[in-house]
Amino acid sequence: VAISGQPGTGKTRTVLRIAKMIEDKFSIGGFTTHPIREEGEIIGYNLKDYTTGEEELSASVRWDVKPRVPGKTPESTPLGIRLDAVNRIATESVAKAIEEADLILVDEVGKLVSESKEFSAILKEALKCGKPMLITMHKRSRNPLLQSIRKRDDLRTLEVTPINSAIL
């Protein structure tokens, strides 16, 4: 199952609710993405391993590193991404989930994690492994990795909106 929606509509909150409802019946592995805000603006993102709770800052407007991805608006400061952090949390947690979990949680497939070739490869492996997955993704992103996920016949996509997020 994929949960899509615009930024801020509650995709992460929705998958965490689902995970909490089923975690006593199924082992869950993977990661979640959490924005870091300062004065209402997103200045970075933490990635968190769902199983271990390990969390690491993986993107920040304060880092002058490559790769850099654009902010939400043309005026926004681009985010510098630490691929080592992406690989340590996102890639490793999904790889471990392929081996050990009943359900693979990937929150979120987007510009942050898709900059990592290692993550893209392990996500493709996860999609082929036959285990159920719970994925969040931006509704309109043209990212090639997201486009390939959207085209899958074996994936059901639900859209989170400001109106339905409270009931999902």
Language-model features: locations:
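Hydrophobic anchor at the beta1->P-loop junction of P-loop NTPases
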Residues: I3
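The conserved Walker
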Residues: P7
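Conserved lysine of the Walker
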Residues: K11
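Hydrophobic positions on the alpha1 helix immediately C-terminal to the Walker A/P-loop
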Residues: T14, I18
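N-terminal phosphate/diphosphate-binding loop that engages ATP/GTP or pyrophosphate donors
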Residues: K20-E75
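Conserved beta-strand scaffold positions in the cores of enzyme catalytic domains, especially
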Residues: I28-G30, L105, L155-E159
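Phosphate-binding/switch loop-helix module in NTP-utilizing enzymes
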Residues: K66-S120, K124
